[in-house]
Amino acid sequence: LLVIPARYKSKRLPGKPLINLKGIPMIVRTYNQCKKVVDHSKILVATDDKKILNLCKKNNINVMMTSNKCLTGTDRVAEVAKKIKKNFYINVQGDEPLISVNDIKKFVEYSKKNQNNVINAYTNVENLKDYLSPNVIKMIFDKSNNLIYASRSNIPGNKKNKLIKAYKQVCIYSFPYNHLKLFGKIKTKTRIEQ
């Protein structure tokens, strides 16, 4: 099941999922990108807002109301997992209207082959602005491609703050049911999520 969490009360940009981008709301654009890869019946928007719920219904998008107590998009996906049991869940953030269809396709295929692992998509950091930005999550992996550490800081760091080979998170994740079940029991955010 591909779940698109959508929160109306964003601190930085309230109402973000409903913002029109060339006449189409952001959440609908994100859904449309996902629908190019995944069948409509296997996509669900999870929201805590009636405006988003109504927009999804109007656009024939499967939607579920979730609690307004969810701290993160992953909490919203964990809440969906309590109601709809699947082997694994793919989380595509609702504010990714330009997410690459090819990236979604590759990620879905990889997730199907690795259903027992938590998977976090990433790509190269291409510019110094992203490398230094606290809004971009940077990631460090071991030689087996296992995530060691994620940070809003510029990692790996260097003395001159120059761009070096670095990776950033892409807002698409995959979780096995059991991992989401455990995640849903955590009631606090880590500092990186704040």
For the regions a protein language model found, what residue spans apply to each?
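Donor nucleotide-sugar recognition loop
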Residues: 187-194
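Short phosphate-binding loop-to-helix
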Residues: 44, 50-109
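Conserved core of the sugar-phosphate nucleotidyltransferase
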Residues: 100-187
